[in-house]
């Protein structure tokens, strides 16, 4: 069980220290107080006219706190993405080479007619492409498949790698240096990691020059890695959470259902709102237009501190997403 003090501290510390080799700034961002009158919108949902705030990251860019996730195994729908962009005002799309839908996504972006400069596009580097040269080639190939001249955010998908005779740390550092160069070049507006633990981030800090702008990790009522969240905030690393509905498992939990009834909101809206109120950039996935619209309508209400804590007590350290490679903590 997570301590109530730690959860409260994390919510109260939703102010991000923004720092890099040249600048240091403190930007207040109290997500728990966000509502439709806030002045941090990056897009407005067309159907409900609710503004979506943007989270500042350490290089000064801003990421919409709500995105649309994609995936493999039926986790992509051309029609749903176009609907999300045109009708729901979604501007943050998350994908990965591993999902196999970058080229299809390019078609959806084109059909939506949303200007490129209004979009935030994230994709990820698969461990099979780790290494300096292969990472560089893979990044350029992803941009080409997506039909864009630059990526807003490029992430190392997992801390593991599969290079015989070399340590994970060595390969991660070499790969990260390739990302740093693409960041300096402007091919990537921001670079980051996914599924990295504190130990991986500490090693990367020691071995490289640019601290990751983002760490994207599994985050939902049953998986609340507060130590990692707090570390990222101290180090100026924006924290993104995927799988906010726990692959649907959270939607039938009695606590979530009770809050759904109390707030007259769907169970998915309760989970997404809880995640956002914790200061987490939240990326739900859906291929159903009505679910996407529902997931966007989370800025017109707030959960009380008591109800936030009720969900906080659901932590069981349950991970629903794992990499098939061995030595994931290596």
Regions found by a protein language model. Name each.
Residues 2, 7, 22, 39-40:
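Low-complexity, intrinsically disordered or signal/transmembrane-proximal segments
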Residues 127, 158-330:
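Beta/alpha (TIM)-barrel catalytic core signal, keyed to glycine-rich beta->alpha loops juxtaposed to Asp/Glu
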Residues 106-116, 143-147, 205-208, 229-234:
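Acidic (Asp/Glu)-rich catalytic clusters
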Residues 34-37, 42-119, 174, 246, ...:
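N-terminal binding-site loop/beta-alpha segment at the start of enzyme catalytic domains
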């Amino acid at each position: 069980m997570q301590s109530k003090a730690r959860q409260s501290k994390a919510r109260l510390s939703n102010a991000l220290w923004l720092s890099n080799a040249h600048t240091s700034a403190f930007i207040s961002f109290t997500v728990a107080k966000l509502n439709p009158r806030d002045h941090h919108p990056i897009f407005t949902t067309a159907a409900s006219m609710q503004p979506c705030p943007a989270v500042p990251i350490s290089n000064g860019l801003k990421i919409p706190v709500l995105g649309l996730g994609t995936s493999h195994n039926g986790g992509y729908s051309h029609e749903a993405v176009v609907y999300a962009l045109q009708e729901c005002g979604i501007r943050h799309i998350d994908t990965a080479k591993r999902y196999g839908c970058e080229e299809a996504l390019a078609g959806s972006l084109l059909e939506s007619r949303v200007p490129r400069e209004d979009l935030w596009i994230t994709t990820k580097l698969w461990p099979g492409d780790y290494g300096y040269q292969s990472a560089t080639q893979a990044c350029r190939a992803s941009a080409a498949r997506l039909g864009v001249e630059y990526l807003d955010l490029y992430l190392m998908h997992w801390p593991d790698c599969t290079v015989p005779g070399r340590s994970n740390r060595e390969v991660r550092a070499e790969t990260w240096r390739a990302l740093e160069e693409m960041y300096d070049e402007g091919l990537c507006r921001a670079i980051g990691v996914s599924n990295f633990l504190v130990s991986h981030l500490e090693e990367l800090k020691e071995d490289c020059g640019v601290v990751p702008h983002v760490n994207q990790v599994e985050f939902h009522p049953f998986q609340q890695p507060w130590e990692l969240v707090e570390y990222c905030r101290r180090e100026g690393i924006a924290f993104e959470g995927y799988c906010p509905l726990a692959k649907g498992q959270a939607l039938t939990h009695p606590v979530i259902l009770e809050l759904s009834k109390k707030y007259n909101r769907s169970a998915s809206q309760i989970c997404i709102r809880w995640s956002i109120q914790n200061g987490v950039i939240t990326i739900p996935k859906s291929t159903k237009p009505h679910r996407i619209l529902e997931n966007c309508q989370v800025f017109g209400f707030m959960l009380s501190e008591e109800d936030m804590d009720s969900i906080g007590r659901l932590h069981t350290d349950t991970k629903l997403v794992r990499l098939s490679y061995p030595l994931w903590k290596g």
